Amino acid sequence: MFARLVRSIFGSSNDRSLRGYQRRVQQINALEPELAALTDAELQARTILLKQKLADGATLDGILPEAFAIVREASKRVFGMRHFDVQLIGGMVLHDGKIAEMRTGEGKTLVATLPVYLNALTGKGVHVVTVNDYLARRDAETMGQLYSFLGLSTGIVVHGQEELERRAAYHADITYGTNNEFGFDYLRDNMKYRLEDMVQRDFTYAIVDEVDSILIDEARTPLIISGPAEDSSNLYRSVDAVVRELVKDPAAFEKDEKQRSVHLTEAGSEKVEEMLHASGILTDGNLYDTFNITVLHHVQQSLRAHTLFERNVEYIVRDDKVIIIDEFTGRMMDGRRYSEGLHQALEAKEHVTVQQENQTLASITFQNYFRMYPKLAGMTGTALTEADEFAEIYKLDVLAVPTNLPVQRKDGDDEVYRTAREKYEAVANLIEEIRTRGQPVLVGTTSIEKSEVIKQLLDQKRIPAELLNAKQHEREAIIVAEAGAPGRVTIATNMAGRGTDIKLGGNAEARIQTELADMPEGPERDAAIARIEQEVQEAHEAVRKAGGLFVIGTERHESRRIDNQLRGRSGRQGDPGESRFFLSLEDDLMRIFGSDRMGAMLQRLGLKDGEAIIHPWINKALEKAQKKVEARNFDMRKNVLKYDDVMNDQRKEVYAQRREFMNADDVSETVADMREEVIDTLITRHIPERAFQEQWDTAGLAAGLRALLNADIPVEQWGREEGVDEAEMRRRVQAAATELMDVKAAHAGADAMRYIEKALLLQTLDQVWKEHLLLLDQLRQGIGLRAYGQRDPLNEYKSEAFSLFNAMLDELKQRVTAILAQVEFGAPPPASADPFVSGSSQFVESHPEPVSIRMAVGPNGEDIPLPPPPPAMFSAAYADVEGIDFNDPSTWINVPRNAPCPCGSGQKYKHCHGRLG
C-alpha cells in the first residue's frame, strides 16, 4: 500500500526515466525544420560532419539529438515514414544499453535505426541480432536502404555463406544476423590459425531483437561445434528394441513431468537386465556394474526418448532425420542435435538413420556470448515479467515504452473445461461464430499435434484454415502477412511467425509480391497494384468494424510472457481486437501444476459436459502457478550459468592464449619454457629434492628422457660422477635438451621451425582443449551426486575443474615437447606456401621410428586435425607402473584410467583399450 502511495506521488521509476527521455525528444523535434529544408546531398553530408565531431572528441550522447533527427528526416525521404516521439524514446533506451519493451506493431525495426546509426558512426561496427535468417535478410535489405542513403554500409550474416562474405559483412558499419550465426562465428574464429582468417571484429555494441526469446528462452541451449566420435549406432538400435518392449509395462519406470525426468523402478531394472542378457547386449554382471556403464547410459537415453519426447511436439521426422522443434517458437531447428546420445536414441526410436555421435570441439551459451559485448541492448513486446532475470544475469534494465496510440484490445477471462475434447469443440464453435462477422481469427497452440486436431475439427465444419507450424516453415511469412484478412482463420504453433506484423485487412505488399510476381512493369501492373491497395484498404475498414483480430489461446504456457506475446498479436497500433484463452484440466500446466483443487471445485459446481467455468479467480490461480514455474525455471537457468561460468572462465583463458600464439611471429621462447618445465618435472620425479645420490633413479630418468626427447642422454654416467648434485644434473639435462633442439632447428631452417612450432602449439592446444571439454561434460553429469555426501556440488565442480585445467596445461607442455623432439624434418616448405592460409599442419607420426612432418590441407581445403602423439611420449605417465610393454596389451592392466592409452590412439586408456565392458 505504501509503495502504491509513493508511486502515485512521484511516479514509478519507469515514469521518471521516460520524463528524462522526453526532454531530449524536444531537442530532437526542434531540429526537424532545419533538416527538412536541406537537400538530399546536404542531409547526407551531415554523416561526415558527425564523424568529424566524434574524431574531435565529441561523445555519442552529445551528438544524439542531431543524429536521431537526421535518421528521422532520412526515413521520411526513403520510406515515407516519420518516427513517432515514443519511437525516439525507444531509440534512446536502446542507445543507453537497456531493454525497450514495445508492444507488437509499434515499429521496433524502425526504432532500431536510431541507435544503430548513432553507434555505427564510430566505425567499430554494430550488430543487430534477429531470431531467424528471414528476418535478418528482410531487415538488412529494408533498413539497408536508409543506412546507404546516409553513407553507411550494411552487411548480413546468414547460414551457408562463404568466409569472404562473412568477413565483409562483419567489416561493414552495421551487421545483421541471427544469434546462432554470431555465436558460431565466434567459436569458428577461435579455431582458426591466423588472425587474418578470423571474420569477426572486436565486439562493441549489439541490439538483440526479440531479446526475451534469445536471452531467456534459449539461455540454457549451448552452441556446440563438434567432430565425429566413435560409431555406436548398432548399440542404439539394439537397446531401442529392448526399451520399446520395456515401456509397455508402466510399472517398469517412474516419470516426473515437472522435472522432465524418468528412471527405472527396481522391477524395471530386473526386467531390462533379463532382456539385455537375452538379446546378448549384456554378457556379464548386472546393469549397474562399472564395466556395463556404457550400456546403462544407452538404456537411460532410450528410456528418455520413449517416455519424455513426443513426435510432432518436441521433434518431427523429415527426410530420414529427427528435427528438433523449438518449444518457444514452434520453429524447426534443423542442424541442432540433442547431446549425450539422446538424439541418436530418438533416431533409433523413429527407425531413421542413426547418425554418428559427436565430440565437442568448442561450445558457448548465449548467456556468456552476449555478456562479452561492452554495450548490449534489446527490444521485445514482452520483457517486464522477466525484468529481474535480465537485471541479475545480464545487468540490463527493462523500460516499458508507451504505445503511440492507446491499446483497444479486449482481453476476456479464461474459459476452463473438464476435457481437451470439450475445449477444442468450444474453440471450433467460437471460430464458426466469429467468421460470420468477418473477423479474422488467430488460434495459438502449443504443439503441431494440437494444431492439427483443431484443423480437423474445422475441416469437419467446412471452415478453411491456414496451418502455421514447423511443417510450413517455408510459407511462414506469407501465411502471417495474410492472417488479418476478413474471415481468415490461422492456426499457429506457439509464436511461429513472430517478427512479422498481422495487419488488419491483409498485407498489400505481400499480395503484390505473390499475385504480380510475373507481371512486367507498365500501366497494367500499376493498375493492378492500385486495385490491390484499394481492396486491402476496404478490407481493413471492414475488419476494424467487425472488431479486429480475435486471438484464441488453446492452452496456457508455463511462462506468462509467451501468453502475452500471443495476445499482443491483436490490437496493434491502436487497432481494435479481442483475446481469450480456452483451457482444460487435461492441459499440461493444469495437469502438472495443481489441477486437483480446481478439478474438485469444478465437480462441486456440478459442471456438465461441454460447460465451462469463467471467473477472475481462475485467472489469478493460473497466474500464481505460472509465477511458480517461472521462478523455478529462473533458478534452473541461474544454476546452469554458475556451472557454465566455470567453463567460460577457462574458455576465455584458452582463447586469449590461443590468440596470443596466433599474433606472435615467434613462439620458440614459449616452446623452450614448456620443454624446461616438462624436463624439470621428470627430473623431480626420479631425483627428489635433498635425496642422496645413491637414492637417485637415474635409469628411470634416462628411460623417461629417451621417451620424451627421442635421444639417449647419459644421466646414469653423470650420476656416478663425483660432485654432481641435483642442481648440476638439472643444468646438464636442460643444456643437452636445448642443444638437441638447436640442431633440429638448424636442420629445418629458422623460418620453417617458426612455422612448425606455431602450428604444433595451436593444434595441440586445440586437441587438449577438446579432450578437456569432454572431461568437464562427464564431470558435470555426475557432480550432483556429491550432494548425498553433504558436499556442495558447485564447489566440488569448481575445484575439480580447476585441477583438470591445470592437468590440461601440463598435458599441452608434455605433448608439444615430445612431438617436437620426435619429429624429423624434411625439406622446409616453399617460401610461397603459408601453412596457415587455408588449413593446419598435418603431423604423420609412427613409433618407434623418427617422425616426418609435412604441411598440408585436406582435399576440400578443410583443416586436418593433429593425429595423436606417439606412445613413447607418454612413457613418463607410466613411470610408477611396473611391467608396461607398449607392444603387449596384456601388460597394460595397471595403466591409470585417465592416462593416455599405450597403443598411441591419443584417447585416454579408459576410452580405448581400457574401455569397460
Curated annotation (Swiss-Prot):
It is a peripheral membrane protein. One of its GO terms (molecular function) is protein-exporting ATPase activity. Zn(2+) binds at residues 901, 903, 912-913. CDD domains: DEXDc_SecA (cd17928), SF2_C_secA (cd18803). Signal peptide: none annotated. Monomer and homodimer. Part of the essential Sec protein translocation apparatus which comprises SecA, SecYEG and auxiliary proteins SecDF-YajC and YidC. GO terms for biological process: intracellular protein transmembrane transport; protein import; protein targeting; protein transport by the Sec complex. Coiled coil: none annotated. Its EC number is 7.4.2.8. It catalyses: ATP + H2O + cellular proteinSide 1 = ADP + phosphate + cellular proteinSide 2. The keyword Acetylation does not apply. Belongs to the SecA family. SUPFAM superfamilies: Helical scaffold and wing domains of SecA, P-loop containing nucleoside triphosphate hydrolases, Pre-protein crosslinking domain of SecA. Its cofactor is Zn(2+). Disulfide bonds: none annotated. ATP binds at residues 87, 105-109, 501. It comes from the Bacteria. GO terms for cellular component: cell envelope Sec protein transport complex; cytosol; plasma membrane. Gene3D superfamilies: 3.10.450.50, Helical scaffold and wing domains of SecA (1.10.3060.10), P-loop containing nucleotide triphosphate hydrolases (3.40.50.300), SecA, preprotein cross-linking domain (3.90.1440.10). This is Protein translocase subunit SecA. Keywords: ATP-binding, Cell inner membrane, Cell membrane, Cytoplasm, Membrane, Metal-binding, Nucleotide-binding, Protein transport, Translocase, Translocation, Transport, Zinc.
